[in-house]
Amino acid sequence: MEAGMAEAGVKLEDSWKHVLSGEFASPYMQKLKEFLLAEKTAGKRIFPKGAEYFRALDLTPLDEVKVVILGQDPYHGLGQAHGLCFSVQPGVRIPPSLVNIYKELQSDLGIRPVKHGFLESWAKQGVLLLNSVLTVEEARAASHQGQGWEKFTDAVIRAVNDECDHVVFLLWGSYAQKKAAFVDQRKHLVLRSPHPSPLSAHNGFFGNGHFSKANAFLVSHGRDPIDWQLPDVVEGDKNLL
């Protein structure tokens, strides 16, 4: 699959390529490649674009991971998904779950909400913004579940667990919390709460203090904290011009 992905313009950062090479050689990844090709051949629009399937890994090398935030699958609206969970491209309306994440950041750390939903600055500091499923068909939520991506991203989580020390896993909602099974909590910190969705945020996401707890854990182990304050303006955000 790696060669096929390379032909599609996909990037995979070297440290990840090293630990995930066995996944790319596996039969399930070949089947996943065939599935995606068939979907595109049938004229279906797939999000994000091929070059951004592995954007979370590209922006956050394995040896730089400090925090892992797990999502389920990409946004399925036009122009939203770009390979980072919860994040949307510049100029796109901030989704409700991310609005609630911003509210908790303000309550927890006094972080000023911004008017965009572009989270790349977190990724570049070591926050792995990983969806469990890395593609989706336009307007069909969860349409690519069960095609192999889950096995791949489970391998990503296992790699972080095995290769890194003192990482914080923020597991929001029951789906993400299942991934705690791959994490050695003797060396990593797992924080659980309800999902930031408007359907569940008031049941314990608000007030969870996860962002301050994550930074306190990092500092206690000699790691630099995350600057959760996003830049006010990002390139390409027409809403802010």
UniProtKB/Swiss-Prot annotation:
Q: What is its EC number?
A: 3.2.2.27
Report the record's disulfide bonds.
none
**Keyword Translocase tagged:** no
Q: Which SMART domains match?
A: UDG, UreE_C
Per UniProt, subcellular location reads as: Cytoplasm
Sorted alphabetically, which InterPro entries does this protein's record hold? Answer: UDG_fam1, Ura-DNA_Glyclase_AS, Uracil-DNA_glycosylase-like, Uracil-DNA_glycosylase-like_sf
Supply one GO CC term from the record: cytoplasm
Q: Which GO terms describe its molecular function?
A: uracil DNA N-glycosylase activity
- UniProt record, GO biological process: base-excision repair, AP site formation via deaminated base removal
Active-site feature positions: 73
Keywords in alphabetical order, please: Cytoplasm, DNA damage, DNA repair, Hydrolase
Q: What is its main location?
A: cytoplasm
Reactions performed catalytically: Hydrolyzes single-stranded DNA or mismatched double-stranded DNA and polynucleotides, releasing free uracil
Quote the function comment for this protein: Excises uracil residues from the DNA which can arise as a result of misincorporation of dUMP residues by DNA polymerase or due to deamination of cytosine.
Per the record, the similarity remark reads:
Belongs to the uracil-DNA glycosylase (UDG) superfamily. UNG family.
- The molecule here is called Uracil-DNA glycosylase
Taxonomic lineage of the native organism: Bacteria, Pseudomonadati, Pseudomonadota, Alphaproteobacteria, Hyphomicrobiales
Q: Which gene encodes it?
A: ung
